[in-house]
Amino acid sequence: MRTLRFALVAAALVAGFANASPTDPRVGSEYTVLAAPQPTQAIGKKVEVVEFFAYHCGACNAFEPTLNAWIKKQGDNIVMRRIPLPFQGPSDPEARLFLTLDAMGKLEQYHDRVFRAVHVERKRLMKDDDIIAWAAANGLDKAKFLEAWNSFGVQTKLKRLPAVAEAYKASSTPTVVIDGKYVVSPATVAQSNKIQDMGQLMTATGQVLDALVTKAAQTK
């Protein structure tokens, strides 16, 4: 009986993978659904999209051009939010850098530059002093940067990040959450569709995101 049960489960899994499609994603295959959906900040018929990422994450760096192009294509259909996943806990320097740039109104200008510094220029931005030195060397006023870096607002948001990540069940990067409940990542898309080519994976991930935004919009 145990052997038969195992065979049936295996057959079901194979069938699930065989029917997987990025343009028609299936729950438990390309994406999962949060048991406790999170509140969203979208207004009207717009769909909120949240990306959990880390600057040192190679997969995030590879995903960034695809995600940026996808955001541009979606336009007014979505509200995009990025949340740094604090791998080092409530004092994570990379997350603090992101929050500091956001507080200064410099995030759009510097977000991609941080990725470039880490993955192209091979800068190690994992310690406070290294980050502060990099910021000063890259055109940011050191005094203003430190003011934001040490501000109550940044410190408060930084301390809340682990709880936010736990609420979204985000433990790896990149992870994208659509409408506070649909969770997808390039890794799950690759696994469910047996994709090994990076170009194909980026295309497929974009298709899954498209489908889930459409699905979410239908309930608005």
Q: Where are the predicted features?
A:
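Extracytoplasmic thiol/disulfide redox context detector
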Residues: 2-92, 209-210, 214-220
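Solvent-exposed, acidic/flexible segments
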Residues: 45-46, 56-64, 87-94, 103-107, ...
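Sec/Tat-exported extracytoplasmic proteins
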Residues: 56, 67, 71-74, 101-105, ...
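C-terminal cap of thioredoxin/glutaredoxin-like
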Residues: 138-220
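Long, low-complexity, intrinsically disordered polar/charged segments
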Residues: 1-2, 107-112, 144
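Extracytoplasmic/secreted envelope proteins and their assembly/folding machinery
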Residues: 64-71, 94-98, 111, 128, ...
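Structural microenvironment flanking redox-active thiols in thiol-disulfide oxidoreductases
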Residues: 73-104, 109-135
